[in-house]
Amino acid sequence: MKKLKVLGICASPRSKGNMEYILGRCLEAMRRNGGDEVEIKRYLFRAKKMNPCLDCGGCYLSGECVIRDDFQRLKELWLEADIVIYAVPVYHLGLPGQLKCFIDRLGQSICAAHSGECNGKEETMPKYLKVIAPLTLGVHQVSGQEQTIMQIINHALIMQCLPVSGDAWQCYTGAGGWTQNREEKDAIEKLAGEGDFSTMALIKAIETTALRALQLARVVREGLIACREELAGDAQYRFVLDKHCSD
């Protein structure tokens, strides 16, 4: 059985801080629950250059984004992954610009490269069926956490993937927390060390999100293997069938 590949993306441009901490807690839980079954990679936006989409149409001619920066490497990792964990700080009630640039260019370039393979000339996205989980953190209590989570969920749906959350009551649509107006880079780690109630609820949400993401990825893998003959004639499933069912 092939290993499940996990990609943890820290979308904060800051050096070692709160987002890296909560991503680390999630990946630790993934490792505890998955053991040798999972292969984990981590990607940090820190010191990376991610330019915005120019809507130039170049990717429709070559199948690749014409802008050369750190986008290409993250796109490769995203395509390889079975589970993508986005650890996202709240900026102005939503996604930070660097991550939005990646998401815009990912959708455009993948659609350009692969949509025609699915249904002739019609623009149809392949079924990537990656499990996508959002973790988010704001400085203030109600400062855009749910909106940021919904942006990631919408991204998952557009990319023909499966959004997942942890368990209620701590987690309905994704794991979201706040640093209680503290701006230190290690604020969440300190609050967790103090046993702060809302921070411990966030940690619980992160851990159950990791577990449910892993379980759903297993269901996807086993379901594809079980249904491969039925799905083989549908070009939209070609990518995931090649990924999970090839020798």
Language model: regions and residue ranges:
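Glycine-rich phosphate/pyrophosphate-binding loop and the adjoining helix
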Residues: 33, 164-247
